[in-house]
């Protein structure tokens, strides 16, 4: 059977972005074993032939009703699949799903019946919220950046915007390319409804949120842009740690310098 990506260059390009990001996550050491997830709303790339495709799985319950996702299509990383494998074989380690009209269930339509991530309800709940606000964001990326996670083991960095201001101050690019900062979510059980609800709430003010002692969750227009936000934040964490390892507390950019950037580049914060 031919791949859903065949003769669909726009869709193939979007899935290949996911594969490229998956490779970066593995190379950086942020995706141990099957760690991390990527879910992308690909509805805009769906044609009539895809809409007529028969499911290759039974109907599966999402576990929650998501009214804004009716008729939407997503590419999802598979459960227990490794990012390093997805980077090479995206359609063997992920699948395309169709949300059914009840907005509470889905079927897999391509290429193989790869069950989506166990965190699918959380990811889809975020996408439902994004659509409810007419957000242009189509991708959600969850990964385990080492240095950012390390910072959450220190109580002071769990206070609102303490980590944001520190990370912004390390290098101008972080302020410029992650302009809404880093939200903080106190530890909650992985894959829980409570974690999903807290994530949606925190994403009202941030594009990237930190799950204490767990990882990062980011949203953006595509998987690459979501990755970029995480990448610049972790670069700042590395600069901070490098300075501490040299035996000094880094000065960082001043509040006045960061405010100057916000005005000059019309940043939201």
UniProtKB/Swiss-Prot annotation:
Cofactor comment: Binds 1 zinc ion per subunit.
Alphabetical GO biological process terms: pentose catabolic process; rhamnose catabolic process
InterPro entries: Aldolase_class_II_sugar_metab, Aldolase_II/adducin_N, Aldolase_II/adducin_N_sf, Rhamnulose-1-P_Aldolase
Reactions catalysed, as given in the entry: L-rhamnulose 1-phosphate = (S)-lactaldehyde + dihydroxyacetone phosphate
Listed SUPFAM superfamilies: AraD/HMP-PK domain-like
Cofactor(s) required, per the database record: Zn(2+)
Active site (record annotation): 119
Pfam short name (any one): Aldolase_II
Pathway noted in the entry: Carbohydrate degradation; L-rhamnose degradation; glycerone phosphate from L-rhamnose: step 3/3
Main function: Catalyzes the reversible cleavage of L-rhamnulose-1-phosphate to dihydroxyacetone phosphate (DHAP) and L-lactaldehyde.
Name this protein carries in UniProt: Rhamnulose-1-phosphate aldolase
Underlying gene: rhaD
